[in-house]
Amino acid sequence: MTRLTRFAVAPLHSMTRRLADVASARVAPDLVVTGARVLSTYSERIHANREVWITGGRVAAVKPAGTARKAWSGVALYDAAGAIIAPGLVDPHIHIESSMVTACAYAEAALLNGTTTIFCDSHEIGNVMDVAGVEAMLEDARQAPLSIFLTVPSTVPATSAELETAGGDLTPDKIAGLFDRWPEAVALGEKMDFVPVTMGDERSHAILAAALKRGRPVSGHVYGREFVAAYAASGVTDTHEAIDRDIADDLLDAGVWVFLRGGPPTTPWHSLPQAIRTITELGASHKRTAVCTDDRDADDLLLFGLDWVVREAVKAGMSPEQAWSMGSLHGATRFGMEGDIGGLGGGRRADLVLMDDQLKPQCTWYGGELVVEHGKITPRLDQALSQRYQYPKAAYATVKLPEKVKLTPELPAKACTVNAIKTALPGITLIHEKVAIEPAKDWPTLFARYGLCFVTVVERHGKSAGNVAYGLLKDFGLKRGAVASSVGHDSHNIIVAGTNEPDMQVAIAAIKEHQGAVCVVADGKVRALVPLPIAGLLSDKRVTEVAEEVKVLKKEWAEAGCTIPYMGFNLIPLSVIPEIRITDKGLVLVPQMELAPLFE
């Protein structure tokens, strides 16, 4: 039996005669899905009483229901019983690593939610393992039962060696090499350093040139309307960071595709309701907008897939037909693949979703193979998910720590000012707050007086003399113990917050033991832990298993008192988002792109 991957369906050029024969009823199709209401993403209409003819994993034609029975006896039929049939969803911007599972494991959740194609920016593993990590992810993707394409990481590291230590450094030449070696490398990933881009930074523009010379589009990441014109002029033609109506409107008029990012509601990333107002209030066309998920942990990936984002677009004022087109055809069109995916026209891949009137997927066909039926994976998909890619040994040895690390600063002996990191919901922007403190007898007294706790970043790539940076979080809410993660964006050094050194040491030891993890510690015991042995970012388990671990983590995280979710905590070292961050080099004042002392 052919392995269930993207490559199981032959290229269109090799199938045109066969498809024409089937569409003309000279040859029987392999499968007919009949009795359906077909959602056309081309005309944005739903056609009643239709059937889809499939051969060789591609759509031959959409016909009136009952046509196949008249032409042939014995053809395989699947009765849709009046349900809606639509093309599989296409997610134009995601990071697989955020789900904490491999590409193969990710496929299970995607297909359960009707997503059959994704465009992945693997800059997380690139920040840890350089080109070797990106290529390992590509090999994983090739063997997954899902169509996965790469937008080559463009900003590794996120800033500079002066401000942080990363495990990878993707130079313009390395990026060009990835484009040249991998046909799946279809675009340049999000160019997060938008300020250097708009200021004409030489390295940033050399990276842009590596893509543009090869005819690859460039994905973006920008905040602030004042940057839009120069950013678009630099060749960036999509972004998922349109966080409100007005910047979304500016971007569309500048010729930039807008990917409306949907939630989930438990995180700070639900910008769709605001950005979509450029369409619903200002009258902009939806033809150059798509919907995306961006980041999902394993738990949220199962609960809030791209189908959920489509339904959110409907709640915000789009018609179901428009919203599904934004979730399928538009993403395909942005990357020039509308001739293969995103619709049910003749010759397209037979990636189909059967759903109810609320646009909730019930069944999924991937390349003409039924992989999800009535909300459950089929034996065919279960077999494919068991044939997972084995990551190289080096991926299981990326947490390199000194034998002993002091995790807390000395208590100030006299009055001073703290450059504190103030956390607040939604948790993306961190506020630089100068806190004047008076001497205290010990840290607990000082913490209680000013609403502070420790935060420390430890370099884990073995590229420094054991860099450790100390900071203080304000209003983080941690009542006891410690929380820690090896997923400290984007360089993925270890970040640990705590109320005391012993519990912080237990947390660091747990991460070292598992070669990566996110954990909660209290009273010297690990209360919750998600092991991440692959690059300190990914589990080697099925997505459903990891989702259960994440549920326990979230429960313990909340009980510890943390005011922002753990995915927001992971962003505390991300030195490209205002106002203040902490990396292994120290406190970073983002607007100035310079380091600051903890105490003044």
Curated annotation (Swiss-Prot):
GO MF term list: adenine deaminase activity
EC nos: 3.5.4.2
Domain of life: Bacteria
Protein family according to the UniProt entry: Belongs to the metallo-dependent hydrolases superfamily. Adenine deaminase family.
Cofactor(s) of this protein: Mn(2+)
Keywords: Hydrolase, Manganese
Gene that this sequence comes from: ade1
Residues in coiled coil: none
Native species: Bradyrhizobium diazoefficiens (strain JCM 10833 / BCRC 13528 / IAM 13628 / NBRC 14792 / USDA 110)
Catalysed reaction, written as an equation: adenine + H2O + H(+) = hypoxanthine + NH4(+)
Top EC class of this enzyme: hydrolase
Any GO BP annotation: adenine catabolic process
The name this protein goes by in its record: Adenine deaminase 1
Classification via HAMAP family: Adenine_deamin
InterPro entries reported in the protein's UniProt record: Adenine_deam (IPR006679), Adenine_deam_C (IPR026912), Amidohydro-rel (IPR006680), Metal-dep_hydrolase_composite (IPR011059), Metal_Hydrolase (IPR032466)
